[in-house]
Amino acid sequence: MKFKFIKSLLGTFLINVCFSIFAHAKTPEFEEIYCEIKVNKKKLALFSLYVADTYEKRKYGLMNREYIKSNSGMLFMWKDLEKRIFWMKNTYFDLDLFFLGKEGQVLEIFKNAKAFDENQIFSKQKVMFVLELKAGVHQIKIGDKLNCAYLNL
């Protein structure tokens, strides 16, 4: 009887600790920058982008946001060229993914990634940046270039 009480008390304590930890887990702080896409040196569009430049920020991405403006998105950054893998877990809206080389040029496009889809999206080439924007809103093409003072591009 005494053992059951202690076991129950310990279980309740552990559950409360877990809830406390998860309740204090918060969204990483994302820096916001402004970048433009250029085609033949002419500005195509200006974007407000959240920067995901750490493991924690890249892991969180646009998850759990219920809305994104048509001129907003997220720019994922790495210091090396590698093939990248994405998914749409806990993402509330469809996205277009633009895979960019080290000079900011669009190398690949994955259109209309579906909200909440946990299937993996792979880049075919090694890339340094991935730009996520609201699906179907922009006419960005392979070869277009991201111009961003923040990145010296």
Per-range role (PLM):
Residues 9-20:
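Bacterial N-terminal signal peptides
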Residues 26-153:
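Compact, glycine-rich, soluble single-domain proteins
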Residues 2-10:
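Bacterial N-terminal signal peptides that target proteins for export
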